[in-house]
Amino acid sequence: MQTLNLTRRVFARLSLALILTTFGIFSAAADALPARKVRVALAGDSTVTTTAGWGAAFEKLLGARGECIQLARGGQSSKSFRDSGMWKKVIESKPDYVLIQFGHNDMPGKGPNRETDPATTYPENLARFVDEARAIGAKPILVTSMARRTFDKGKIRGELAPWAEAARKVAAEKNVPLVDLFARSIALLEKIGPEASAEFDPKGDKPDHTHLSPKGAEVMAAIIAEELRKVEPALGKLLAE
């Protein structure tokens, strides 16, 4: 009987040791797995893209600390971005954050497939983006469009003001973080003036006061990063200063 009890105790101890060893192996393996990078999707028009906007500069600030999913497309408005299927791609990319910036192609003169009303259809489009991003567990962040670098007696004309104001209202109503790039860009451009602002224009045969040179992209991306540190610190801390 004593031999049987001793055998049982030895077996129990060996079993416990095996369980603890196995648990330790799995724990070590889990610790060794690389952490999933934060995924940041960019939804917008050409001023958000890699080649003509602040997209590439933003991705550089994010660096290896996250994954930038560039889904902005030139010529898109808050209406056409959905109609073209690009918003579906944003949702399918399963991002943690979505930066949403539209306005330039929502203005009159862009045609019925793109134009929106800043009092009705534009805020409705933004609100729908917000709701659908949240439905998949992503955090939407609204970004007002940067101002065009068109001056009148030292002041920016600010044609995009109604769309920027509409975005602010949606952000307030939906309790969504807002990067007011429109206001920040106007303040900067009027401070440095037309001559210095021209350095933000991309090189080309025709004047372009809408899109960005590499320097302009870096400046706008830095403003966005600065604002994100205020309104969405969890994302902002991932962006280099």
Question: What role is predicted for each listed range?
Answer:
Residues 6, 84-241:
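Alpha-helical cap/lid subdomain in secreted, periplasmic
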Residues 20-27:
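Hydrophobic h-region of N-terminal signal peptides that target proteins for export
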Residues 28-75, 86-94:
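Serine-esterase "nucleophile elbow" of acetyl-processing enzymes
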